[in-house]
């Protein structure tokens, strides 16, 4: 099993959980307007879920509760958990789940074997230790149940990196794990991974950048060393950003992960 120390060697960044929660809290009201990535990624992840009746489901990193609602509509009892109180408040207002709890995926506030399905759509990339997060999700899953998670992987947002490089700046992006690192993080857990690319298009660079901010994904683990984007920089980015007939592109390397709980 890969150690926490080794994970940090692979992904050298310290996650400030309060700052992450604050970033997503600021995005809570506008989140669903910008969450096409989360919806498409979650739909792909749902394809790996085994059917069942009246399941107890944990939505870990629930955000506004979009997929909590999907699970609940299927007749399942859903517990929504998130770092951000504001996200939970939004989920509660939408009656997305049956129970709402603030909490950290790396220290889940549940007894062993509490859930039939543990669902975490695009949340574990905000964890300090993926090995610990996966162990916690498995711990609270009942024997015969499933852990279903998705995350961003190495190579995501190549258009952002390339555009910033062309104007002589380093891209204000977090690092994401490679598939081999994710496999190592699972250790002896019964994990299967399915990787794929998802590309979204936007009418202009500002819209593309706003989509990142709108889902709360602008918090940098290494801090905001690059500051705000100036009008001149935005104009330069417009000139060099990769695009096609649909508009300015944002490409995500994604993975759906399934852990079968024996």
From Swiss-Prot:
Belongs to the methyltransferase superfamily. It holds the Pfam family Methyltransf_11. It comes from the Bacteria. It is an enzyme of class 2 (transferase). Pathway: Cofactor biosynthesis; biotin biosynthesis. The gene is bioC. Gene3D superfamilies: Vaccinia Virus protein VP39. This is Malonyl-[acyl-carrier protein] O-methyltransferase.
């Amino acid at each position: 099993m890969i150690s926490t120390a080794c994970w940090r060697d692979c992904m050298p960044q310290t996650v400030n959980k309060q700052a992450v929660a604050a970033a997503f809290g600021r995005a809570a009201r506008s989140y669903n307007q910008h969450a096409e990535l989360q919806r498409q990624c979650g739909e792909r992840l749902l394809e790996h879920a085994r059917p069942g009746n009246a399941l107890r489901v944990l939505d870990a990193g629930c955000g506004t509760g979009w997929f909590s609602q999907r699970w609940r509509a299927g007749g399942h009892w859903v517990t929504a958990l998130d770092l951000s109180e504001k996200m939970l408040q939004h989920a509660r207002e939408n009656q997305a789940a049956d129970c709402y709890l603030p909490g950290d995926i790396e220290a889940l506030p549940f007894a062993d074997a509490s859930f039939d399905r543990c669902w975490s759509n695009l949340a574990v990339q905000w964890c300090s230790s993926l090995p610990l997060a996966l162990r916690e999700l498995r711990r609270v899953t009942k024997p015969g149940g499933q852990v279903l998670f998705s995350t961003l992987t190495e190579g995501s947002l190549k258009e952002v990196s390339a555009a910033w490089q062309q104007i002589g700046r380093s891209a204000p992006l977090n690092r994401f794990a490679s598939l081999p690192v994710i496999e190592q993080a699972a250790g002896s857990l019964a994990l299967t991974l399915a990787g794929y690319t998802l590309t979204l298009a936007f009418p202009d660079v500002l819209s593309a950048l706003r989509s990142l901010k709108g889902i709360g994904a602008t918090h940098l683990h290494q801090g905001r060393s690059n500051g705000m984007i100036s009008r001149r920089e935005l104009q330069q980015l417009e000139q060099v950003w990769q695009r096609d007939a649909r508009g300015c592109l944002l490409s995500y390397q994604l993975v759906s992960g399934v852990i079968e709980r024996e």
